[in-house]
């Protein structure tokens, strides 16, 4: 639903519906023993939904949910995806920082963002904002591919994860026939 019912939608009623859906997901996560929910905050879609619109509208809605996140002890984790939003690690870091809550962090997808810059650089810049990871590979010649067959420099990724003392969860994502 996060592609159709977005926190960044031009229609305030759709944004409210998205916020209510996220609150429900947070309660459900708590109910099953989860610690976080994944969120795609919006999608850049033209003049009515620009990068700045996604930034401003999604932050406004996310901030409304911070008290619930704190009460439930459920993190809202913003995932890095191909939605036209924050394709530079500095932008994504600044977006997380603009929300200004320990309950809102990053769900960094290693393969997704390799397309826009070396994954190890993203990890270094995001630092301890990266609470959880998706692990997959991506290559400029072969798209999503088995681990080790794309452009991700896994040795540098591991090094940067050690440097930021990453201790969160890493989920293997993909149906690429790898590992």
Regions found by a protein language model. Give the residues of each.
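Histidine-acidic metal/acid-base catalytic patches
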Residues: 27, 35, 63, 89-179
